[in-house]
Amino acid sequence: MIDPKLLRNNIEVVNAALAKRGVQLDVQEWASLETRRKDLQSKTEKLQAERNAGAKQVGQIKKSGGDASEIMARMQAIGDEIKAAEVALSELQNEIEQKALSIPNLPDESVPAGKDENDNVEISKWGTPRQFDFEIKDHTDLGEWMGGLEFETATKLTGSRFSVLKGPLARLQRALTQFMLDTHTLKNGYTEAYVPYLVNADSLRGTGQLPKFEEDLFKLQGEKEYYLIPTAEVPVTNFVRDEIIDADRLPLKYAAHTPCFRSEAGSYGRDTRGLIRQHQFDKVEMVQIVKPETSMQALEELTAHAEGILQALGLPYRKILLCGGDMGFGATKTYDLEVWVPSQNTYREISSCSNMGDFQARRMKARYRMDQKKTELVHTLNGSGLAVGRTLLAVMENYQRKDGSIEIPEVLRPYMGGATFID
């Protein structure tokens, strides 16, 4: 959630920033809400002052032995008015908060304006796409030929957009996961975390999925309001919800491997073949909790950590700075990493690394203590390090051989019992 003070006092500044996203707030509506809020608050304060003055007057009259019944009756009436005004003010503040929860984060000054992915800016490329001297297969054909990737079985078990991995491909996915976790924890300084795959609504509100994006989530039916996590970002970032952290503990850096569950609402007909877009997929997520003045530097570091995985695997990729219109709801700045997919002759997203500023922290009431008295909102960051299924398909396609076997990247061989290829 953006700073309510900005909405109250600088709505034009908010709109100027949101213009990069192609979003504009109704200035008159917000001005009207603020006028009503101020009027109700002023009315409540005046009534409270009148009641306090009346209470003193009643005390003085009783002390002198006089009759205070008329004033006491008035005080009772004022009390009823105060209750009504407080209810009205509370309802209005709730209305304002609900509207504010649906406003996306303000883009950083360095973020380009734009509508969609066509307006994103390529920052750099790494690696050269391999030139094959044979007709290549996509990962679906490779996996089915090997007998280790089954979509029909998954459809029988659950439905479309699910998959089953078996044998060497299952082991290769496990190897990728272990390699990512080992790199982030042993080399990059993250603390490994395993978390619940079910979260409550408060957690999803804290990171920004609720209330605006409920249709993208899987919600359990039952007495308790539980949701399957769309990303480990949700439970891990909420570690600091309602917490005040000592400044010397920052930054906090966590890496978590979880399955992720997404309804993919609005993506009907897109990427229906293969592992690109699944309802359930594994991901290693990086989360950082930092001081505000270091968050942009932390974004560069976190993105470099994701790039390091791709470089170690020898997978060509490019780094993209997202424009305002293509950024996620809670981000103030985002880099996407897109890996080369030979069968599609293009780059596809494999990691998204975002600085959320204090957007999530304000929702979560997550602060750090600067001194004995003063506290300030932390900044939160998250990024994929990496999406495991998409990394698997990238390895399969980029390392395929003419006979249909797949060479194992050198850094993964210790996790594969020393094997150099699978078939």
From Swiss-Prot:
GO biological process, one term: seryl-tRNA aminoacylation
Coiled coil: none
EC category: ligase
InterPro entries membership: aa-tRNA-synt_IIb, aa-tRNA-synth_II, aa-tRNA-synth_II/BPL/LPL, Ser-tRNA-ligase_type_1, Ser-tRNA-synth_1_N, SerRS_1_N_sf, SerRS_core, tRNA-bd_arm
One cellular component (GO) term of this entry: cytoplasm
EC code(s) of this entry: 6.1.1.11
Residues binding L-serine, per UniProt: T231, A232, E233, E285, S384
Binding site for ATP: R262, S263, E264, E349, I350, S351, S352
Reactions the enzyme catalyzes: tRNA(Ser) + L-serine + ATP = L-seryl-tRNA(Ser) + AMP + diphosphate + H(+); tRNA(Sec) + L-serine + ATP = L-seryl-tRNA(Sec) + AMP + diphosphate + H(+)
Pathway(s) of this molecule: Aminoacyl-tRNA biosynthesis; selenocysteinyl-tRNA(Sec) biosynthesis; L-seryl-tRNA(Sec) from L-serine and tRNA(Sec): step 1/1
Quaternary structure and interacting proteins, as annotated: Homodimer. The tRNA molecule binds across the dimer.
Function (record text): Catalyzes the attachment of serine to tRNA(Ser). Is also able to aminoacylate tRNA(Sec) with serine, to form the misacylated tRNA L-seryl-tRNA(Sec), which will be further converted into selenocysteinyl-tRNA(Sec).
Note on domains (UniProt): Consists of two distinct domains, a catalytic core and a N-terminal extension that is involved in tRNA binding.
NCBIfam families: serS (TIGR00414)
Family classification: Belongs to the class-II aminoacyl-tRNA synthetase family. Type-1 seryl-tRNA synthetase subfamily.
Name listed for the protein in its UniProt record: Serine--tRNA ligase
Native species: Acinetobacter baumannii (strain ACICU)
The gene coding this protein: serS
